[in-house]
A protein has these predicted regions:
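C-terminal catalytic "cap/lid" subdomain
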Residues: 1-144
Length: 144
C-alpha cells in the first residue's frame, strides 16, 4: 500500500469501542494484521518496555528486544499506565502478541519526540523491538 495509517480511537468520547477493542493498542494491532503491515509502531509515553515502571523507578531497565511474549513478560508489565490512555503496558503487550503471532514485528517508542520516527527509519536503535514469529512470516516475505 505504501502508506502509514495512524490509528487512534478518540479516548475522550469513544468509550463503547474500548470494551470491544481494548483501546488504541489492540485496534492498531488488528488494523496492522488486517492490512498485512510490514511493522507496527506503537507510540507511548515511555521509551519502550521496561523491567519496572520507569516513572516510579529510576533504575528501571529497558528491554531492547523481546523475542516472544511469555507469561514472564506479562508479569513484568504490571498496571494500567497513565490517565492519558486506557490500556497501559498490558494492552501494548496484547497488541504485540497479536501482530508478532501474525508475522509482523512491533516497536514501542516514546511518542513525545516528533523526530523519533526519523531516527527509527534511519536505522537508529531506539525503543523496544518485538520480534515477529518467523514461522508466520507474511506470504510476500516468503517469496523473497
Amino acid at each position: 500500500m505504501n502508506c502509514i495509517p495512524i490509528v487512534n480511537e478518540n479516548d475522550a468520547i469513544s468509550t463503547d469501542e474500548l470494551t470491544k477493542f481494548g483501546g488504541n493498542d489492540i485496534l492498531s494491532a488488528l488494523v496492522a494484521e488486517f492490512c498485512n503491515a510490514d511493522v507496527l509502531i506503537n507510540m507511548s509515553d515511555v521509551d519502550g518496555f521496561y523491567d519496572s515502571d520507569p516513572r516510579s523507578n529510576p533504575d528501571a531497565k529497558m528491554f531492547d528486544r523481546v523475542e516472544s511474549i511469555t507469561d514472564e513478560i506479562y508479569s513484568i508489565a504490571g498496571g494500567a499506565g497513565t490517565d492519558r490512555g486506557t490500556g497501559g503496558m498490558i494492552a501494548k503487550l496484547n497488541a504485540a502478541k497479536i501482530v508478532t503471532e501474525a508475522g509482523i514485528p512491533m516497536f514501542i517508542l516514546n511518542g513525545s519526540d516528533p523526530e523519533i520516527l526519523y531516527t527509527l527509519l534511519d536505522g537508529g536503535h531506539i525503543g523496544t523491538y518485538f520480534c515477529a514469529d518467523k514461522s508466520k512470516r507474511k506470504a510476500d516475505d516468503a517469496e523473497d
